From Swiss-Prot:
Zn(2+) 1 binds at C60, C62, C75, C78. This is DNA-directed RNA polymerase subunit beta'. PANTHER family: DNA-DIRECTED RNA POLYMERASE, DNA-DIRECTED RNA POLYMERASE SUBUNIT BETA. Disulfide bonds: none annotated. InterPro entries: DNA-dir_RpoC_beta_prime (IPR045867), DNA-dir_RpoC_beta_prime_bact (IPR012754), RNA_pol_asu (IPR000722), RNA_pol_N (IPR006592), RNA_pol_Rpb1_1 (IPR007080), RNA_pol_Rpb1_3 (IPR007066), RNA_pol_Rpb1_3_sf (IPR042102), RNA_pol_Rpb1_4 (IPR007083). Zn(2+) 2 binds at C778, C852, C859, C862. The RNAP catalytic core consists of 2 alpha, 1 beta, 1 beta' and 1 omega subunit. When a sigma factor is associated with the core the holoenzyme is formed, which can initiate transcription. DNA-dependent RNA polymerase catalyzes the transcription of DNA into RNA using the four ribonucleoside triphosphates as substrates. Pfam families: RNA_pol_Rpb1_1, RNA_pol_Rpb1_2, RNA_pol_Rpb1_3, RNA_pol_Rpb1_4, RNA_pol_Rpb1_5. Mg(2+) binds at D449, D451, D453.
Amino acid sequence: MRSHNDFESITIRLASPERIKEWSYGEVKKPETINYRTLKPEKDGLFCEKIFGTTKDWECYCGKFKSIRYKGVICDKCGVEVTHSKVRRERMGHIELAAPVSHIWYYRSVPSRMGLLLDMTVNQLKSVLYFEKYVIIDPADSGRSRGELIDEEEYHGYLDEYGDKFVAGIGADAIKELLARIDVDAEARMIRQKIQDKDKISDKRILKRLEVLEAFRDSGNRPEWMVLDIVPVIPPELRPMVQLEGGRFATSDLNDLYRRVINRNNRLKRLLALKAPEIIVRNEKRMLQEAVDALFDNSRRKRAVKGKGNRPLKSISDMLKGKQGRFRQNLLGKRVDYSGRSVIVVGPELKYHEMGLPKKMALELFKPFIMKRLVDLDLAPNIKSAKKKVEAEDKEVFDVLEYVVKEHPVMLNRAPTLHRLGIQAFLPVLVEGKAIKLHPLVCHAFNADFDGDQMAIHVPLTPKAQLETWMLMLSPHNILNPANGHPICGPTQDIVLGIYYLTSELPSEPGAPLKSFSNLDEVHYAIDRGVVEFRTKISVYHQGKILETTPGRLIFNTILPEGYAYVNRPLSDKETNRIIADVYDKYGPAKTVLMLDDIKKLGYRYATLFVPTISIEDIRVSPGKVGLVGDANKEVEKADSEYRKGIITNEERRKKVIEIWTKTNDLITESMFKELEKDKGGFNPVFIMAASGARGSKQQIRQLAGMRGLMAKPSGEIIELAIRSNFREGLSVLEFFISTHGARKGLADTALKTADAGYLTRRLVDISQDVIISEDDCGTEESISLGIVKEGENVIVSLNDRVFGRYTAEDVIDPVTDKVVYPRNTLITREVGQKVENLGYDKIRVRSPLTCESKQGVCIRCYGMDMARLIPAEIGEAVGTIAAQSIGQPGTQLTMRTFHIGGAASAKVQEKEHKVSYTGIVNNINGRLITNEKSQSVFSRRGSIVIQRLIQQYKTEELSNLRVENGQKVDKGELVATSPSGENITSAMPGAVHIENGIFRILGEEAVIPVKTGTVVNVKVNDITQPNQPLAEFDPYNEVGISEIDGTVQWMDLEIGKNVRRDEDLRTSNILLKVIEQRREKLNPRIAVISGGSREEYSVPVDAIISVQDGDKVKAGDILFKIPTVAEKTRDITGGLPRVDELFEARRPKDATTLAETDGKIEISGEIVKEKRVLYIHPDNPDQEKVKVTIPIGKQIRVRNGDFVKRGDQIDDGNLDPHDILRVKGVTALQVYLVQEVQEVYRLQGVHINDKHIEVVVRQMLRKVLITDSGDTSFVNQQQIDRLMFNEENKRVIAEGGSPAESVPILLGLTKASLNTESFFSAASFQETTKVLTDAAIKGKTDNLMGLKENVIIGHMIPAGTGTKKYKDISVFKSAYGDLDRPLEEEEEEEIPQSIADDSDGDE
């Protein structure tokens, strides 16, 4: 017999009336439920036993047949079949309607499917369905057309005129008739023809209509099935009625809704039988329509049907929707048996793979195993008495418990489970008490602490489940973080402190002789005798050489694996983690886990031994603080007076003040740390806690002993009154009051943002859940380029880190010898990466999930290494879910950050000048420079300074025997020449040789420094610059507009009172002229400078502050207007999480920048159309037409008349719109942009996420293409299609000799993409349940159950990991005999050969 679970796919369609009758076991005729006296179901009612089956097992309604003997007999008296009462969960009934009614899903949803088929609007449909207007079905010769609406009078007029030939109807009857008359095929053909005749169809409705028509054509559904003649009644057990104490009944809302339908239907039947007047019948029909609407979807209606207490009743649709609906509550999240939960306490004596299980819990969790064992050992005659024994907690029960629990892994879970490390398996160790004991090093993965956290415990029951738990989920298999491959098991807090103390070194007297020892035992002896301290410097003979070290470090090195290089430095948490990662890399997980337990022991032991304690005396305030605060006060006073004199604006003053305090705070922090470091010989406990990474940060100690600094308002704005005190000195009342902002913001943020991050994770999981590793190699030729990530000059991510765990997409060639070092498809390990770096590469091409061409999921080569185990991913790995967790989990963590700093603001100090940290040579200065009155060179437009690193420089006559030639690349340490004295000259860094005018230079790479308008340049081309020499100076607070010629100012379209506001500052009586938005008139604000025959015009954007009056004389280089840059807000993930959200949802930014669509020359026309300026780009190629660009008047334009732009350049200010990047620059540019921007946010928070996780999500966002020309394919224009389906269909059409479809890639945000998945189950359980199901039913969609979610919903094993199709057919046998899957009874029936019976000692 096939099990009902053995199916590959599920199809959803509209049900025909015949189909509904087939399902039904009888008609429900009465609205009654149960008899109030006998409490038995009423016959023909909603709970009727004749229709839905018996309520008592093997017993009919009247009691004539009572026992399993009569199985299948139908009682002649009451008509009830003798069977299981379970059938009441599956047998359906039906209600025969006296008049057809329309299904609310199909006429009320947007877009209305019925409306599209009939070409009517929802309101027109409603007026017909609710009996307000007639619709013409057959117009005869009236000159009207089918589907038109007419009112009562017209109807009667036409009837009198044309008699029976004219047919019009009202109500669902008429709609049904119209639907039945639609010839879906012909209509679809007609529309396709129409589309082909026209070039561009502007009416989207036509395309939508075509889609619906073709859906009906292809799915075999009939349009008239959207109107119901029969309503199915769902089984009574699914809408139960239960008796409460006190004799009242609680019933499901569905019963009330069904009752209304039946009542109205029966009343309508009677009215029709009595031939009642039309108006009464119509009213009843309308009420029936409303009753059925309410039954199917009560929340869709304007006035929902209310039950007791004015609560809207829950209809069938509401049962499916939302977090409490069927999908999310019962199908995707079920409660699990064999589980318990309790508070956790720390278990420092446990091994890494163990957890302490309270005996009380173990007794309950392992009950069935204990009972079986008791019976097996003949300690109990049968299961029943064994159960009694367990409940009585007899002595032998506890002896058995030890045996049962041994080597039976259990799973621990801490909510919220943000990533897969939130559930791990351990071996239980029985403990007294009621609390679960947890190993301290796994806390980080669970994000657990011992302040009252609770954890849940689950017991895997079957041998297969235990095996899987053992092999995959045991904690030693999970010591790396899947997000980045770093250890997640590193020590924290006390352990770190203990290790740091143990490995640190006391400052010794200079020149004092060191004590010497010959081996470790001697050192131990000396410590025990008190001759040396753990941290004294000693010299010792170790592994064949003499070491200068400390006894503590010797002790620490004993726990490292044999052969590991001696660690001779103080170990902070970062250092310890580095060692763990290194040991994992070199020795594998087994050795690492052993070492972890030793580290834990050492850490706790020495933290106890050194007893670091904190007292208020340890918080040392730096004596230099008073002076620094005094200086700051003076500077603030100076800024104030400048403002009062009118030299600077209020906004500039504010920014200056904030900068002064930020800088002062940094200086105080520095001097405070120096103070702390000197205190107690470098062992000040507060300092050590921060230095070792055990607790606290620079930020927190700064607030304790420095100054609290600037605080942020809830809006993120910075309050310019700095808090000058610290917590050691205590805050003044005002300071305390300002502080309250931050404290409250922290708490509010935590609450709100956690929900946001959780929702982000949910959307990420939803979009990427069906990305599973499906094959070894998809064979694609595509790849992406990955390189070093820099911020200014600093390398933030090295090449090795960036490409680690990928496969190379091209051969890696040694640039010197031209030999292939690593062929294509080499896995990049740490060594390979290091070697590639040493070859001088700064970027290479690698395989990526973005370019993978697998039909389902991605392939191993494109994905690369599984970051949690550092080996290539395996087929069946659910990499999509891992990616979603890796991105979502830090989001949730980071939102909690504000909480700890207490709202102290962090603003960056604004740079005023451009400089580089090395010696350089100025290669080029791009841009237009003018000399101003002070004879400084000023950039009058945006430009750039190109500077190249100068590594070495010699005069050629100082060198003899040159080994290199001009332009040649050299590596670090490569011999380039010898000096006349015969010394070898080698290159200090990789670079290129440059010989010119008798000077030999080795130059590094070029750096291009972009500069803004108004920047003053201090260098010339070919200047040699010193490290940190200011190359150029600029105004950090304003963008400026600069005159390029001497002349007279003329205001154009600038009028005070219209688009210029005259602000007078009351405090200083300075006057500011500010440009504001002007809607009514078409003004194009500009400032012109006129000099003789020439004139230059400058567009003035909104918010600009005008610095010159009409008629003023100006010199070249003078400032015409300033645009204040936006005040810095604090940058924390609060800014970050919405940013990530915005990127993944692919939202268009508010003021998106305009990108140049082509290369060419700018022409600013001066035209204004609809409050937008018009620009033209003239392409280089004269055959191409000029491209028109429109820009809102208020925005600042980045280009000037006659400038050249490249395709994709920004023309005005604003944020980049990802959709524009896709359109203008293409898919690759967009992928790079999205990955970079998301990484930027996380990097700012110090969170490491491997690029590949973000790439997996971006791949899913770019799955669809938009059809622009359907060719001979079955697609419709403007339809969104999966890229793979698009390619398949095109292949098919080309093979048949047709013309393929054309498309453009589109970017879908998370929510849109999730709702557009191929699987309707997955989409329905995500959001907009009814809409998804409506759509799927009409299209007759088939869900092939490819993703994880669909399979969880229908109760299959997920097609990932051990459930992958590839592994389905593998069967496991126990000692080559008997199948593990087979039920036990079968096994007992077979004669087991003696030899096997002997060695199978209960290993099941």
